[in-house]
A protein has these predicted regions:
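Short glycine/serine/threonine-rich phosphate/pyrophosphate-binding segments
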Residues: 107-114, 135-136, 253-254
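Residue-level signal for inorganic ion chemistry
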Residues: 18, 40, 78, 129, ...
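ATP/NTP phosphate-donor binding region
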Residues: 1-98
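Active-site segments that bind and position negatively charged phosphate/pyrophosphate groups
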Residues: 203-314
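C-terminal charged capping/lid subdomain of soluble metabolic enzymes
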Residues: 2, 184-186, 286-368
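Solvent-exposed alpha-helices and their adjacent loops that cap or buttress functional pockets
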Residues: 7, 32-33, 93-95, 118-120, ...
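A glycine/threonine-rich phosphate-anchoring loop and its flanking beta-alpha core
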Residues: 16, 114-207
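Generic secondary-structure signature for well-ordered alpha-helical cores
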Residues: 59, 91-94, 160-163, 169-176, ...
Length: 368
C-alpha cells in the first residue's frame, strides 16, 4: 500500500493506492470516515464490471447505499444529467451527513464531484477512480465540472474529496484508448516536474498497456499522485503554480471541443496538445532540436489517434478563445524550457497557435 497526503490548510485528505483493494473500500470508509449513509454515482460500464464488488464491500460494513447510474462518456458531463441526478438525490431524502461516492473514470468523478459539491450546499465526496487518467489526475485536487456546448468544464467548483481510494488492478479492463488517454497525463507529470520519471515511464509503457506488475504499477500511480498533491498543496485554487498542470490542455481542450467530446479521449487530445505546446517552446528557442525530437519520439510511441477531419485552424482558435483559462482575451500556454525543471505559463498569440496546429497536421500525415 502507498499513502499520499494532500496537505491543505482546511481540507487535507489521504490518497490510498493499493492493488486489489476495491473489496476493502467499505472497511476503509468505516475506519477513516465513519459514514453510514451514502449514494454511489457510477456509469453503466463500471457498474457492470465492478459494481457488485463495491456494493458488497459497503454493505458488509453496515452502510445504507443507493446507486445512481449514468451513461458512459463525456456526454454525461452535462447540465441535463446533473439536473436528473439532483432530482434523484432529492427523492432519496439524503442529509448532509450522507456521502457521495464517485465510482468511475474522469467523467464520473467530475460529474459526481460537481453534483455532490452543490447538492444541499455540499456533501462529502469520496473518489474511487477506475481509469488511469482519473487515478493519476482528475480524482485528486478537488476540481469538479460539467461541460456546456460552448466549451469544456465551464461550470464547476473546487470541492476537495474526503479521501481518494485507488485500486490499480481495475485498470486491466481498460481499452487501449483509455490507457493511452491516461498515459498522456502520466507523461505530463514527468515533463513538468520529474524528467527521470518521464523517461522511466517511456521505457516501461507495457506496464500500463498490459497492466503488469501490480507493485510497479502502484508505485507509478503513486508518483503521479505525489506530484499532484505537492502542486495542489502549494496552490489549491489554481492561481499560480497549479497552472503548470495545464500543460497540453490549452490546445488539447480546443481539439477535444472541436471533436465533439467523443471522437477523442480527453488524455488523447492532451497528448496532441502537449506536442503543439512543445512546438511553440521549440519555435521560441526554449528547447533544442535534440530535446524536442527526443520528447516527440517518446510521445508518438503512443500510437496517436487521428485528429478531427473537419477541425480547421480557425475553428480550433475559436474553441481555444472560449477556454476558461483565457484572461482578458489573453491565451496562456504552459511552455517547457527544461523538462522537469524550468516551466513557465506564458502568453501565446494566434500566429503561434496556427503554427502549432499546422505542425500537428503535418505530423499526423507523417505518422499515418
Amino acid at each position: 500500500m502507498n499513502l499520499v497526503e494532500v496537505g491543505l490548510e482546511e481540507a487535507s485528505y489521504p490518497i490510498i493506492i493499493e492493488a486489489s483493494s476495491l473489496s476493502s473500500t467499505g472497511e476503509v470508509i468505516r475506519k477513516r470516515i465513519g459514514r453510514k449513509r451514502g449514494v454511489v454515482i457510477t456509469d453503466e460500464t463500471v457498474d457492470e464490471l465492478y459494481g457488485s464488488d463495491l456494493d458488497d464491500s459497503l454493505r458488509n460494513e453496515g452502510m445504507k447505499i443507493d446507486k445512481l447510474v449514468v451513461e458512459p462518456g463525456e456526454g454525461s458531463k452535462s447540465l441535463d444529467v446533473a439536473g436528473r441526478l439532483y432530482q434523484e438525490l432529492a427523492e432519496l431524502n439524503l442529509h448532509r451527513d450522507s456521502v457521495v461516492l464517485a465510482f468511475g473514470g474522469g467523467v464520473v468523478g467530475d460529474l459526481a464531484g460537481f453534483v455532490g459539491s452543490t447538492f444541499l450546499r455540499g456533501l462529502p465526496v469520496i473518489q474511487v477512480p477506475t481509469t488511469l487518467l482519473a487515478q493519476v489526475d482528475s480524482s485528486v485536487g478537488g476540481k469538479t465540472a460539467i461541460n456546456l456546448a460552448r466549451g469544456k468544464n465551464l461550470v464547476g467548483t473546487f470541492h476537495q474529496p474526503e479521501i481518494v481510494l485507488i485500486d490499480p488492478v481495475v485498470l486491466e479492463t481498460l481499452s487501449s484508448a483509455d490507457v493511452r488517454s491516461g498515459l498522456g497525463e502520466v507523461l505530463k507529470y514527468g515533463l513538468i516536474w520529474d524528467e527521470n520519471f518521464f523517461w522511466k515511464t517511456v521505457e516501461s509503457l507495457e506496464l500500463f498497456e498490459e497492466v503488469g506488475d501490480p507493485e510497479e504499477l502502484e508505485a507509478s500511480v503513486s508518483r503521479c499522485c505525489e506530484i499532484k498533491a505537492e502542486v495542489v498543496g502549494r496552490d489549491e485554487l489554481d492561481k499560480g503554480l497549479r497552472q503548470i498542470l495545464n500543460f497540453g490542455h490549452t490546445i488539447g481542450h480546443g481539439i477535444e471541443a472541436g471533436s465533439g467530446y467523443g471522437e477523442l479521449k480527453h488524455g488523447e487530445a492532451v497528448i496532441w496538445g502537449m506536442i503543439g505546446e512543445l512546438w511553440i517552446s521549440l519555435n521560441r528557442g526554449y528547447l533544442t532540436d535534440e530535446t524536442f525530437d527526443q520528447i516527440l519520439g517518446a510521445l508518438t510511441r503512443l500510437s496517436l489517434p487521428a485528429l478531427p477531419d473537419d477541425l480547421t485552424n480557425a475553428r480550433l482558435l475559436e474553441y481555444i478563445h472560449r477556454d476558461k483559462k483565457v484572461r482578458d482575451g489573453v491565451i496562456n500556454c504552459v511552455l517547457i524550457k527544461e523538462p522537469g525543471e524550468d516551466i513557465d505559463v506564458e502568453r501565446v498569440g494566434d500566429t503561434e497557435l496556427k503554427g502549432a496546429w499546422e505542425f500537428l497536421r503535418s505530423l499526423e500525415v507523417s505518422q499515418g
